[in-house]
Amino acid sequence: MELGYRVPIFDIDGGTTAIAGELARVGEAAEASGATWLSLMDHFFQIEPTGLPAEANMLEGYTTLGFLAARTSRIDLGLLVTGVTYRHPGLLAKTVTTVDVLSGGRAWLGIGAAWFEREHRGLGVPYPPVAERFERLEETLRICAQMWDPDNNGPFEGKHYQLAETVCNPQPINKPKVMIGGSGERKTLRLVAQYGDACNLFGSPEEVAHKLDVLRRHCDDVGRNFGDIRVTILAHDGPEPGATDEFVRAMGDYAKVGVHTAIVMPPGGSPAKWIDGIAPVVPQLAELN
């Protein structure tokens, strides 16, 4: 099993002027730890599950990934996850391409159907009903695939999006892998089977095993090899520096049901120090495979 990080909190010791330096140290610490994935949360406002108010710090995701791309050299980079409503799909494909080119081919597209209504209303971003958001998500996945096809610069005609030209130059160095967040059995996991390179799940090992059974059936329905999909989980109860054995034991149960990557969330304050403190987890998790 591999380890990844998702940075959800930007309230940093030292205040606003300390954020850039701390994020640079996060990138350095993440790579030094041997983790394979570094991601950020993508929201306009802070979300309630962090325990912080909506008014807490929240940086724009792709700008911050560009900053991290310049301060790392090996680790994969992505957002976990971008709401489909946040950016027009043509611009989204160009943005992810830019991160990929500037990082030397390390960008992923992490995407989901969006859920936080308050931030949409707050900034005046349209928030359509859930059925429409999933329609838009599927069209966005198709648009990104077309824009990352160097042999297809033609139009895209969808129900919600119409692009006269799907030009994207330069092309990505490596076609960005697509991680689709969420575990809805009827829509989300079907989209993973059709378009995803990775899923991101949560819940107990038994719940994750059930979701993977559903995903496997969707793969059978669309003729997809289930083994080609990387299985990741968001581990809400992360390790504590100096006390990692309990976390590794818990992740062993997830490895048994087929999870490839555990993604943990550094706290605010001094996240780089926390990453340094849990680095011994990486070789321990590697032994679970």
List each language-model region with its residue ranges.
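Internal, glycine-rich beta/alpha segment that forms the wall or movable "lid"
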Residues: 48-52, 79, 85-195, 209-215
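N-terminal small/glycine-rich loop or linker at the start of catalytic domains
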Residues: 1-15, 74, 116-123, 157-176, ...
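Active-site mouth loops of central-metabolism enzymes
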Residues: 7-21, 82-90, 174-184, 234-245
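Acidic (Asp/Glu)-rich catalytic clusters
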Residues: 31-32, 65-74, 96, 100-106, ...
